[in-house]
Amino acid sequence: MLIALAGVTGVGKSYYSQEIENNFNIKKIHTIRTRAIRPGEIDGITGYFMTEDELDNEIVRGNIAIDFSEFGGRYAYLKSEVFSNDNHVFEMHYTHIDGWKKVKPNMISIYILPRNIEIAINNIKSRNLSKEKEDERIKEVYEQYNNFMNNKELQKKFDYIVYNDFNDDSKTELLSLIGRIVKKWIFL
């Protein structure tokens, strides 16, 4: 089983993917990134950090399931994890839903929607990004939020939409949903 979490930057995708890993027999997929490693991130745990050339070599070797450019960097995922028999969760950018559904048609997609967009914005501001990168991310949050809210066809592409109020009730709701998905998946 592969579960994808999407939503605006700062909505809690990383937090919830960690909670899912902690509460269920579901591992996080390691995202390959070509951007610089951030303080607190650990290569091989947070994800894999590669140069452009290293990623290109992995593609040539046939080890990459999907790759794309976003936020001025390249991102990719290993076939060995995407097509594993293990249960996995990962975070994806909402614009890649169609590509992911082609790669993994039975993937379960969850869009996490903030009820209060300003909390997501404050989460971005707490990341110690450069002013330019912070402004870029905040602009993208508003664009993504408005696009998602006004595009019913886009909303239909996701299996579930859950709201994050950034509280225990939201956490309980999302983890309960994951519990139901896991139970249903076991009996397929």
Task: Report the location of each language-model feature.
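Hydrophobic anchor at the beta1->P-loop junction of P-loop NTPases
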Residues: L5
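P-loop (Walker A) phosphate-binding loop of NTP-binding proteins
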Residues: V8
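ATP-binding Walker
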Residues: V11
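Walker A/P-loop
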Residues: S14
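ATP-dependent small-molecule kinase phosphotransfer cores
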Residues: T31-H88, Y94
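Conserved phosphate-donor/acceptor-positioning beta-strand/loop module used by diverse small-molecule
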Residues: V89-H93, V103-R127
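Small-molecule kinase domains that catalyze NTP-dependent phosphoryl transfer to phosphate-bearing small molecules
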Residues: L129-L177, L188
